[in-house]
Amino acid sequence: YHSGFSVASGETLLVFDYWMGRQGKKLPAAQRITPETLSHFSEVFVFISHGHEDHFDPVVYTWEQYAPVTYILPETMDASLHGRRMGVGGEITLSRHVKVKAFDSTDEGLSYLVEMDGIRIFHAGDLNNWHWREESTPREIEEAERDFQQVMETMRGEKVDVAFFPVDPRLGMMFDAGPNYFAMVVKPRLMIPMHFWERAEVIREYARRSRSPQTEIIAMTTPGDMILLEFDEQENMTVHMQSVTSAPVARNKKVQDR
């Protein structure tokens, strides 16, 4: 939901930027992470990119009552929050299944590249080209682009299987400049747009027109939408989409390793 995603492999669960929504637009109860959900996993890793309301819900700190939870958060966040703290460029081995590397953001906090059972997952947090082109001065636009491109250079050459990246229509004209540049530089095998503020129709159109032979793009627009990834012996990846609003669909889209 919004920028919140969970990724499971075996008995390991990753949770990124969990948020239950604003009052009046709360995440449906059936789509929330519950004690029952957590009970299925022997290790849970909760990644918090920064402290903005829409990326950090304090409810995550109640989960450790129900499962072995490790929290990963920026070293700049409130000192009262416990967990493994990271700075830009830091790397931590969290378990024999999971390790993480922290990258910078163009807003607060961090973005994370997590490897779980050989699958490399990037969550951008609020990393984007926040140019606000229709409101900003030419100098502000240039600075926003430069700051974003500098972070992208630190990611050049990183292998990414799945990327969660902001595609925010509020930016107005050229709202897709950031994700397009990210896809060009990093070439993730699968990109999932996020942070689109209920503008599902924009994201569906973006996914339709922006996918490429290098990067498949799938719009997960409804809380509870799921994707199943399968890998063969040659590391080709097959993507199966299941939406809560329709019957399961096997896209059988094979994305070959780079």
Model-derived features with residue positions:
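Extracytoplasmic
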Residues: Y1-H2, F41-S42, Y66, S95, ...
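Pre-active-site segment of Zn-dependent metallo-hydrolases
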Residues: G4-F47, P58-T62, L127-G157
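Binuclear metal-ion centers of metallo-dependent hydrolases, dominated by the metallo-beta-lactamase
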Residues: H82-L94, T106-E108, D176-R258
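Active-site-proximal loop/helix segments of hydrolase catalytic cores
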Residues: T106-M184
